Amino acid sequence: MAETNRAVIKLREKFSASVLDVKEFRGEVTVTVKREDIVEICNFLKSSLAYNLCTDVTAVDYLGKQEPRFMVVYNLYSIPNKDRLRVKAGVPEAGCSIDTVSCVWSAANWLEREVYDLMGVVFNNHPDLRRILMTDDWVGHPLRKDYPLQGPGREPYKGRLS
Amino acid sequence: MASTEIMTVNMGPQHPSTHGVLRLVVELDGEIIQKITPHIGYLHRGVEKLSEHRTYHQTIPLTDRLDYLAPMHNNLGYVLAVEKLLGIEVPERAQTIRVILAELTRLKSHLVWVACHALDIGAMTVFIYAFREREMVMSLYEKISGARMTSSYFRVGGLSSDVYDGFEKDVREIVDTFPGHFDTYEGLLTKNTIWLNRTVGNGVISAEDAIDYGITGPALRGSGVDWDLRRDNPYSGYEKYQFKVPVGEKCDTFDRYKVRLVEMREAVNIIRQALDSLKPGPVLADAPQVTYPPKENVYNTIEGLIHHFKIASEGFPVPEGEVYQGVENPKGELGYYIVSDGGNKPYRMRIRPPSFVNLGAIEKMAKGSMIADLVAVIGTLDIVLGEIDR
């Protein structure tokens, strides 16, 4: 079914070199693309395929599990077609950055700031890339897998949670 | 010509209309808003991080603390996402009860919204009335789950237990009396000149801008976008119920007020239909690897006891994969994006918070209006800071 998905067919046609992987799980289609082309692909998805609602931008840290380390995830929705699509782009630890899509959807502005704050992925050309949940002088990115649950500089609690 | 000077004013975190820890740094030209820089507070419960260190069942009590006005909706989105990952089917009775409770929760949440919104603008009576009605839903929560606010009543695979005897009678009493109460609120507000002056034409955001900013829920429908997840991406059997999705025209605070009031009436409609279709049956899925065994087995058989202990302490493995599940929260689309690596804990759980995204558009909505109207704009977004800061 993933291969017959309208968006997947169009993306393969237009960006054959950038589509790295297409997967379907529990009826949800995920397309992995090259990070260099993310803005172009998002622009195309919005203008030609009516994915007008950027539901969510987030990231997953695959420390020691797979390369590249980070996966930036875009959950998109098309209000006219009532259709969901997930786009992912891998970001390596060295040169941990990807272009911003806040020029495509304004919703991405705050969502990308949150990813930057908690995961440490830098969004190039972002209009206002500041920390949003943590204080400005906070050190580290709490949602990274190598960031301890108890916070930095504390002896880990040896009980149930650690 | 006289030169003008921009004045910077801190609004919040102690301002009564900023609902908790929100601080808005407002730059003013006279009383006209030039720029707003929101600082969204430092509650930091760290729900996403904590859930990576807890089993799937242990995460449920974290989710209902996100939006303490709509705990059952938060539970619902989470358990639906985990059920989707597992690929299990929930029995019909459990689904119907989930819908009844979700809609009661919508009423509960919207009641607090109408109360606080009216109070922010200066109407005290509605506040007292709405909290009185909310008490009925709260005591129903208490009878069902033992808790008035953070119920944690839903389980992966169904419900923690069946509802008590007399549940239907109590719910019927609520749905029979509530429409009259809504009439009272409308009588107090809808044609009230002060209310109209404060809300009509205030906080306007066009349909196109609202979608662009990712606004969802009543705030989006107030801008005239006919979109509701319950109808367009149905879950828990919502496709079986007939209900209207109200939309606004003028995209202002008054339209969002009207949309939410109609939504409350429609919620009562849905609860009535669900009550009529409620049949006896099991409330837990037939998935013994995931659900707790019945209490009589736990007490009377050693296998049941061991199984209960294993699920409570070790949890259950979940197939590798990733899912996203959105539910129509009173505030908008609440989504759970869960990545599983095959273990008994979520590898990554991301919560898509509606209030966070809605608040992102506050500058767009309030720029150019008077500072006094900013209070009405914050109220109309119906934000909960616990969800924004997770």
From Swiss-Prot, chain A:
Location of the protein in the cell: Cell inner membrane
A Gene Ontology term for the protein's cellular component: plasma membrane
GO terms assigned for molecular function: NADH dehydrogenase (ubiquinone) activity; NADH:ubiquinone reductase (non-electrogenic) activity; quinone binding
Enzyme Commission code(s) on record: 7.1.1.-
Top enzyme class: translocase
Protein's UniProt keywords contain Lipid metabolism: no
Entry keyword set: Cell inner membrane, Cell membrane, Membrane, NAD, Quinone, Translocase, Transport, Ubiquinone
Domain of life the protein comes from: Bacteria
The keyword Cell inner membrane is assigned to this record: yes
Catalytic activity reported: a quinone + NADH + 5 H(+)(in) = a quinol + NAD(+) + 4 H(+)(out)
Database matches in SUPFAM superfamilies: Nqo5-like
Protein name: NADH-quinone oxidoreductase subunit C
Organism this protein belongs to: Geobacter metallireducens (strain ATCC 53774 / DSM 7210 / GS-15)
Organism ancestry: Bacteria, Pseudomonadati, Thermodesulfobacteriota, Desulfuromonadia, Geobacterales
Swiss-Prot record, chain B:
Keywords noted in UniProt: Cell inner membrane, Cell membrane, Membrane, NAD, Quinone, Translocase, Transport, Ubiquinone
SUPFAM superfamilies the record matches: HydB/Nqo4-like (SSF56762)
Membrane-traversing stretches: none
Membrane topology: Peripheral membrane protein
Cellular compartments annotated: Cell inner membrane
Coiled coil: none
Subunit record text: NDH-1 is composed of 14 different subunits. Subunits NuoB, C, D, E, F, and G constitute the peripheral sector of the complex.
Stated family: Belongs to the complex I 49 kDa subunit family.
HAMAP family: NDH1_NuoD (MF_01358)
PANTHER family in UniProt: NADH DEHYDROGENASE [UBIQUINONE] IRON-SULFUR PROTEIN 2, MITOCHONDRIAL, NADH-UBIQUINONE OXIDOREDUCTASE 49 KDA SUBUNIT
Role according to the record: NDH-1 shuttles electrons from NADH, via FMN and iron-sulfur (Fe-S) centers, to quinones in the respiratory chain. The immediate electron acceptor for the enzyme in this species is believed to be ubiquinone. Couples the redox reaction to proton translocation (for every two electrons transferred, four hydrogen ions are translocated across the cytoplasmic membrane), and thus conserves the redox energy in a proton gradient.
Protein name: NADH-quinone oxidoreductase subunit D
Organism: Geobacter metallireducens (strain ATCC 53774 / DSM 7210 / GS-15)
Gene: nuoD
